[in-house]
Amino acid sequence: MKILFISLGCDKNLVDTEVMLGMLASRGYEMTNDEQEADIIVINTCCFIHDAKEESIQNILEMAEYKKNGSAKALIVTGCMAERYRQEILDEIPEVDEVLGTTAYDRILDAVDAALAGQHEVMTADLDALPLPETKRLVTTGGHFAYLKIAEGCDKHCTYCIIPKIRGNFRSVPMERLLKEAQDLAEQGVKELILVAQETTLYGKDLYGEKSLPKLLRELCKISGIRWIRI
């Protein structure tokens, strides 16, 4: 079966998309960029600002039309908008089969199975969970560079920002996990890593009791094949 994946929003969202793509590819699904031939459509949404929310809604409505009039059998919505407007999406857009919250994207295979079985539900997890699937990412950035998400969420609950409510509190990815992921990316031909997080310089404080970005950088520099690291 063929899957169309639409990824909206920031680089951190793109990393989640690549993780889901890797999981789907491991199951044997074929990726396509053609809405007309897609059996399953997945939209990884953003709603950080009003324009991003509008773009997400527009994409969902457009893909809902392809589901009604094309070959698509399932429409799945993931990401920040899915986390914020969980039930509303299912209630107001009946073409949507499954909604995955920001910390439940590692259940994408379950969501596909449920959608194809005709179920309509919201899949969520604890907002402070940290999904760490073992499947290798499917890099979509052209091969020579890739984003490495070193942390998730934010502890600063600013009145103008919704990130903690849709991404949870700040939590670092364990260093050994990041080094393994970076090694996997290097083996796929990646030469340049771009480290991303909501608060990059805070990396490691929650896990190791002190800011550990310098140590992480030193360890990443030891990986053969990685020539550049951007922060």
Task: Report residues per predicted region.
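Periplasmic OmpA-like peptidoglycan-binding domain that tethers envelope proteins to the cell wall
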Residues: 206-207
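Proteins enriched for Cys/Gly/acidic motifs involved in redox and nucleic-acid/cofactor modification
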Residues: 1-203
